[in-house]
């Protein structure tokens, strides 16, 4: 079962900048407008933070100092925000999030088509209380004739929705905040990382 906790779902930007300032800068970079060696950051694109003062306006760029240190809790997952804020954003911005079990079911359809068989990474189940979940396939993933693990990793995948990208990575259920252990994750990227871990024989090969 999925672990019933929200304690560790928020990645603290203060910890991130301590680990690697370059990494945080890369995450904040607007890859569309940054050109000729000049970086432009993504902007807030919301008025929700304007009450915090200068730098938090709708079109202001998100700078590291605005979300770290004493401001380390400014950015947080939607599920950890106040319920009134969540409801308001749903009504005003059509902000809706998908349960992990639905993300898993739809990602499974993609893999069923690619592998030519069902239940490659996990099997969808419904428990006695009606909860939808999944049972992980703990065996090493095998590949159909004519396809290799590198083919799978190189396959292009795109999430057509926006927000917290639950179809790509699944650290937690975006609707409940429940943390999902690594071995149970169901995102498209999660699956590729599992395949790499099962097949790469050296750290250099893993990092390619």
Across the structure, where does each feature detected by a protein language model lie?
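Class I S-adenosyl-L-methionine
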Residues: 2-208
């Amino acid at each position: 079962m999925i672990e019933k906790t929200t304690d560790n779902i928020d990645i603290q930007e203060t910890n991130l900048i301590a680990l690697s300032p370059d990494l945080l800068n890369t995450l904040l970079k607007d890859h569309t407008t940054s050109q000729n060696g000049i970086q432009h950051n993504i902007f807030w694109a919301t008025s929700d933070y304007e009450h915090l003062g200068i730098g938090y306006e709708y079109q202001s760029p998100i700078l590291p100092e605005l979300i770290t240190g004493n401001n380390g809790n400014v950015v947080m997952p939607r599920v950890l925000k106040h319920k009134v804020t969540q409801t308001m954003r749903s009504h005003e911005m059509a902000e809706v999030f998908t349960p992990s079990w639905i993300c898993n079911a739809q990602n499974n359809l993609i893999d069923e088509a690619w592998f030519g068989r069902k239940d490659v990474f996990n099997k969808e189940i419904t428990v006695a209380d009606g909860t939808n979940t999944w049972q992980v396939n703990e065996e090493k993933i095998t590949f159909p004739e004519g396809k290799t693990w590198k083919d799978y990793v190189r396959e292009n995948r795109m999430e057509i929705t926006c927000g917290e990208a639950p179809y790509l990575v699944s650290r937690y259920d975006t609707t409940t905040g429940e943390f999902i252990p690594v071995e149970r994750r169901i995102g498209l990227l999660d699956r590729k990382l599992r395949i790499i871990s099962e097949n790469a024989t050296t750290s250099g090969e893993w990092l390619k």
